[in-house]
Amino acid sequence: MENVTLINSYNGIRIGPEPNVRHRIRSVVGCVLRRGIWLDNCTDIGRIENVQWHCHWWSSPKVGGDWEKLYKYMWQNCEGFVFARTDWEYVTNTFIFPVKIGYHFIATKNGTMNGQLCGIGADASNRCIVVDAIQPMGLLITNGQFVAFEGENPIEILINPTCEGSVRLQNSDFWGPAIQNVVSHSKSFVSLSNCYFSSGRQKEKALVEADNGKIQIEGCSFATAEPSILLGNGLKHAIVTGNNGDKGVKIAFASDRSVQAEANHLKDGAQNDDSQVVSGVRQDRIARTANHQDSLQPE
């Protein structure tokens, strides 16, 4: 499917649940009300490239549209890209505005997804990404841009406790007045590398929070004054290294498991000191190296 505009579709494109392979969707744009692309039961590599969903195709006065009604309906109801079973999916240069959930990863009787997503974006959302279920090797997300501010408790990325696969984000931006940027309840691995985090909406909740599984946060920048990172009760292991912030990197720790904090920016002129970086953690739970050591786990 190529070079198509959808003006006012309720559901845009459905692939599956019948068995299928090697779809290619390229240079498709338009306004979708409930779902943009819904994908399931693809057992050989599919590709989605240069797809943009936006309310302006149908909200224009030239076609008798009403921006306010359409905008509200989409952020309250629309899911831009829904992925169930698909193997080795390639998603490149995609975007949606506005949206309830930009990219939703789910399980069906056919299974779940693994794949890579590069140059993806979601704006005016309640959730940019929600991960309910993925395959163990999971998701590789690179060069993402995520903005959430609509509805109750807007969060850019939410990884639910039903997730048992790896989620890895590299070189991505999070901004706009979201309550939080990333919240992970995942049982598996989460990696955040070379990302930009910000909000400015409130001062209580951490921009990044994890309370399950294992997380790595490396080489990231925290641009606003909220607590940067909350390592919550239930987290199995954390590596936090080489990060900086507008007024330092503020890390709160509520778990009895090990955390490794090294070479993080505390405040202007300060050297890294684990007792300053991590609040509320026993010193024997802090690793002095940047490598995961099983011996650091409590008995």
Question: Where are the predicted features?
Answer:
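Extracellular/periplasmic carbohydrate-active domains that bind, remodel
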Residues: 1-299
